Amino acid sequence: MSNPNEPARALLPYLQRADELQKHEPLVAYYCRLYAMERGLKIPQSERTKTTNSILMSLINQLEKDKKSLTLSPDDNMHVEGFALSVFAKADKQDRAGRADLGTAKTFYAASIFFEILSQFGPVPPDIEQKHKYAAWKAADIRKAIKEGRKPTPGDPVDDDTDLSIPSSGPSGSYDHSASDTNTTSHHRTELDPPHDSNDDSSHHQFPEVPQHPLPPRFYDNPTNDYPADVPPPPPSSYPSNDHLPPPTGPSDSPYPHPYSHQPYHQDPPKHMPPPQNYSSHEPSPNSLPNFQSYPSFSESSLPSTSPHYPSHYQNPEPYYSSPHSAPAPSSTSFSSAPPPPPYSSNGRINIAPVLDPAPSSAQKYHYDSSYQPGPEKVAEALKAARFAVGALAFDEVSTAVEHLKKSLELLTNPSAGAGH
């Protein structure tokens, strides 16, 4: 693919984060894909390519399959927020202890992605927005220091006039994801180059550059928030404070040994929170959070030259993307120009064709109780199904759109129809 303006470039950071989390945090992975799909559907038809359309159509089908194995609820935003705060806290603790490295920058960047996808649930609280900006800035600042051969400066900006705003690269307002990273873009290649170790020369990992002009004040402008490296303050919710998070041990940690344990959300937390059940207050597990060993990017070679697919996470037994120090996990996503596999077989392959319930006979008339009022969960599910139908129509997938519309109608009119299935 020679088009440098491929719209699908902006979706890859969210899809790559979803791949990393698929096994141990499928709910967060689902919302990463949902956010990517919603962004993708906003791409004007005139700007879409065959690659764009293929990714979006496959995303719709993948989300439908993922929903069957998940239990969605109105409180999912709290779970995603808690996970984002935990990832942020892990990077922040390592940075403030003076141990920041390229892995720390990648973890900060991943946290900024998780903070960003919270916007799909509604307005983001100011403290989360500040952490989002700080995480993105910190990723760039650490990367810049390593590139210049100096030790990253721990904690907040030394200069009060340092710009913490997120670099913008387009109408979406998100920072640039287009830098080349040979370790991450192999997800979406038709022909793959040998993977590169993430510990190679740092020039292989492109992060947003730190802005050179002063704008807003420092992130922590409250004196009470200028906490020392070893005793961070509690975050603005009941999620565990940084001092209960495991100390980072370097990029060689095995990712995802324990799933994230969600903690209830309260607006006014006590001063000191107990650690979550997966942590020990004295000997915390260093592996309870993922190590994000790649920086999302999109190089020219990452786009196929033929009509691609964005199928399941089990397209190939050897994943295209994995941590360099851990065994490959079957959670990668790939493009393929070969004929699609069967819809769903015992070896884990999933076809990108939609797997939907059989449609009722066209001769069957639809009857429903007009006095029935569906609950909020059913209305939310019906809205999602309707969105999928609109997305399918954008690719002339009429039959798929009809099935989603029928599902939406069923949720709104049938008391026995189940939400989240």
From Swiss-Prot:
Basic and acidic residues: bias regions: 188-207
GO cellular component labels: cytoplasm; endosome membrane; multivesicular body; nucleus
Highest rank taxon of the organism: Eukaryota
Main location: cytoplasm
Impact after mutating F388A: Reduced SKD1 interaction
One Pfam family of this chain: Vta1
Biological-process GO terms, alphabetical: defense response to other organism; late endosome to vacuole transport via multivesicular body sorting pathway; mucilage extrusion from seed coat; positive regulation of defense response to bacterium; protein transport; regulation of vacuolar transport; vesicle-mediated transport
Keywords tagged on the record: Acetylation, Cytoplasm, Endosome, Membrane, Nucleus, Phosphoprotein, Plant defense, Protein transport, Transport
Region annotation (Disordered) ranges: 146-374
Keyword Nucleus attached: yes
Bias type Pro residues, positions: 245-258
Post-translation changes: Phosphorylated by activated MPK6 and MPK3, this activation is required to trigger multivesicular bodies (MVBs) trafficking upon plant infection.
Compartments in which it is found: Cytoplasm; Endosome membrane; Nucleus; Endosome, Multivesicular body
Topological relation to the membrane, as annotated: Peripheral membrane protein
Low complexity: compositionally biased ranges: 294-308, 317-337
InterPro entries named in the record: Vta1-like (IPR044538), Vta1/CALS_N (IPR039431), Vta1/CALS_N_sf (IPR023175), Vta1_C (IPR041212)
Null mutant phenotype: No strong phenotypic alterations under normal growth conditions; slightly slow growth, slightly pale green and flat leaves, and reduced seed yields. Increased sensitivity to Pseudomonas syringae pv. tomato strain DC3000 (PstDC3000).
Biological role stated in the UniProt entry: Involved in the endosomal multivesicular bodies (MVB) pathway. MVBs contain intraluminal vesicles (ILVs) that are generated by invagination and scission from the limiting membrane of the endosome and are delivered to lysosomes enabling degradation of membrane proteins. Thought to be a cofactor of SKD1/VPS4, which catalyzes the disassembly of membrane-associated ESCRT-III.
Subunit (UniProt): Homodimer. Interacts with SKD1/VPS4, VPS60-1, CHMP1A and CHMP1B. Binds to PROS/At4g24370. Interacts with MPK6 and MPK3.
Stated name of the protein: Protein HOMOLOG OF MAMMALIAN LYST-INTERACTING PROTEIN 5
